[in-house]
C-alpha cells in the first residue's frame, strides 16, 4: 500500500483565467477540428463532442439530430443488426460520418460488430467500451479489433492513468476514453472506492497519449457547458457527454408520469435498470454501479447543443482562442473554492 500526495482536481475545483483577446465576436471562433488518426490513417473533421454510448443517450435519433451540428454519436451496443440495417438505409452519408459503432468485448459482441460494419463502408468509428479498461483481456481485444479493422478508427476505454493510456494506444487504439466514476448516474466511486478526479485524469492522459501520437476523449463529469470548455482546456481532443444530453426527445428513455408531469428515465449502464433490461438482472457476484433518475422532459436536443456550443465559443473568446484547437494552449487554470453565486439557485 502507498499514498500519492499529489493534488488531483475535478472540474469543480478550477476556473479558466481570462486573457487578452483580439476576437470581436463569439462568431469568430472556429469549433471544427480536423484529425488524422494514428492507426487507421483516417481523417475526420467536425466538432469533437460525442454523445455517450448509453441506451438513453446514444440512439439513432440522437445521431440524426447531432449530425446537423457536426457532433458525433456513439450509438449504444444494444441495437440489433437488423435495426442497424434499417437505420443505415434511411440515414444520409453525412449522418453516418458522425456515427460510432459501440461494442463490448465478448465473442458475440465482436461477431455482431463485424456484421454491422459490413453493412456500410461509411461506418468508420468503433467504440470499444468497458467499465474497467485495465484488464489484460481488454487490451487483447483492442489488439484483435485493430487487426480485424485496420482502417477503422478505434476508441477504447475507460482508463484514467497515463501508463494504461499508452498501453491501449500501443495495442491499436486511436482514441482512449478517459474517466472512471465521474458520470452523473455512475456510482462506481462510492460502490468500489476506485476513481480519479476527472480534470487531472484528462491532463495526465492527454500528455501520455499525445506523446505517442494518440488522442483522448474525456468521458463523464461535465454538468454544464463550462465543464466542456475545461475538459478541452485540459488537453482532451474529444469530450463525451451523457447526462447533459439525456432527457430529450431523441434520448430514447422511457417516459413516466407523476402528478400530471412527465419525466424521462435516465440510468447508468452498470445500474440495476440497465442490467435488468439487457442481461436479465444483476448477477449474484456483482453490485450495480449506477443509478436511475427521472429527468423533466427537455424538448429537442438541438436547443441543448446550441447552448453547449455557444458556451464553448464564449470560453474561447475569454482566452483569445480563435479556434478550439488553440484553447489548450491558451488555458491557465486557477484553483477555486466556489464556481458561482448560488443565492437564487433554489428558486
From Swiss-Prot:
Disulfide bonds: none annotated. SMART domains: IMPDH. Its EC number is 1.7.1.7. One of its GO terms (biological process) is purine nucleotide metabolic process. PROSITE patterns: IMP_DH_GMP_RED. InterPro entries: Aldolase_TIM, GMP_reductase, GMPR, IMP_DH/GMP_Rdtase_CS, IMP_DH_GMPRt. It is an enzyme of class 1 (oxidoreductase). GO terms for molecular function: GMP reductase activity; metal ion binding. Keywords: Metal-binding, NADP, Oxidoreductase, Potassium. It catalyses: IMP + NH4(+) + NADP(+) = GMP + NADPH + 2 H(+). GO terms for cellular component: cytosol; GMP reductase complex. NADP(+) binds at residues 108-131, 216-239. The active site is at residue 186. The keyword Flavoprotein does not apply. K(+) binds at residues 181, 183. Pfam families: IMPDH. HAMAP family: GMP_reduct_type1. Catalyzes the irreversible NADPH-dependent deamination of GMP to IMP. It functions in the conversion of nucleobase, nucleoside and nucleotide derivatives of G to A nucleotides, and in maintaining the intracellular balance of A and G nucleotides. Homotetramer. This is GMP reductase. It comes from Salmonella gallinarum (strain 287/91 / NCTC 13346). The gene is guaC.
Amino acid at each position: 500500500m502507498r499514498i500519492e500526495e499529489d493534488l488531483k482536481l475535478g472540474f469543480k475545483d478550477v476556473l479558466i483565467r481570462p486573457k487578452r483577446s483580439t476576437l470581436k465576436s463569439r462568431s469568430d471562433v472556429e469549433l471544427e477540428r480536423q484529425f488524422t488518426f494514428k492507426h487507421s490513417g483516417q481523417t475526420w473533421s467536425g466538432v469533437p463532442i460525442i454523445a455517450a454510448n448509453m441506451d438513453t443517450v446514444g440512439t439513432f435519433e440522437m445521431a440524426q439530430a447531432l449530425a446537423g451540428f457536426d457532433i458525433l454519436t456513439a450509438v449504444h451496443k444494444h441495437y440489433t443488426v437488423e435495426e442497424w440495417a434499417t437505420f443505415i438505409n434511411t440515414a444520409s452519408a453525412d449522418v453516418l460520418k458522425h456515427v460510432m459503432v459501440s461494442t463490448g468485448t465478448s465473442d458475440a459482441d465482436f461477431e455482431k460488430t463485424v456484421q454491422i460494419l459490413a453493412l456500410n463502408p461509411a461506418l468508420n468509428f468503433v467504440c470499444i467500451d468497458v467499465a474497467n479498461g485495465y484488464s489484460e483481456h481488454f487490451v487483447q481485444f483492442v489488439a484483435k479489433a485493430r487487426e480485424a479493422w485496420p482502417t477503422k478508427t478505434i476508441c477504447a476505454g475507460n482508463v484514467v492513468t497515463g501508463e494504461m493510456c499508452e498501453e491501449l494506444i500501443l495495442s491499436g487504439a486511436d482514441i482512449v476514453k478517459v474517466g472512471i466514476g465521474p458520470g452523473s448516474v455512475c456510482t462506481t466511486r462510492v460502490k468500489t472506492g476506485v476513481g480519479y478526479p476527472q480534470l487531472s485524469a484528462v491532463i495526465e492522459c492527454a500528455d501520455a497519449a499525445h506523446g505517442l501520437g494518440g488522442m483522448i476523449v474525456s468521458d463523464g463529469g461535465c454538468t454544464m457547458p463550462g465543464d466542456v470548455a475545461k475538459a478541452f482546456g485540459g488537453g482532451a481532443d474529444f469530450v463525451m457527454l451523457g447526462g447533459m444530453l439525456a432527457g430529450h426527445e431523441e434520448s430514447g428513455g422511457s417516459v413516466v408520469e407523476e402528478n400530471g408531469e412527465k419525466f424521462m428515465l435516465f440510468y447508468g449502464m452498470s445500474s440495476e435498470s440497465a442490467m435488468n433490461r439487457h442481461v436479465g438482472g444483476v448477477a449474484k457476484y456483482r453490485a450495480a454501479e449506477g443509478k436511475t433518475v427521472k429527468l423533466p422532459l427537455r424538448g429537442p436536443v438541438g436547443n441543448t447543443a446550441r447552448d453547449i456550443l455557444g458556451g464553448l465559443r464564449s470560453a474561447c473568446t475569454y482566452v483569445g482562442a480563435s479556434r478550439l484547437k488553440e484553447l489548450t494552449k491558451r488555458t491557465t487554470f486557477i484553483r477555486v473554492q466556489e464556481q458561482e453565486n448560488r443565492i437564487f439557485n433554489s428558486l
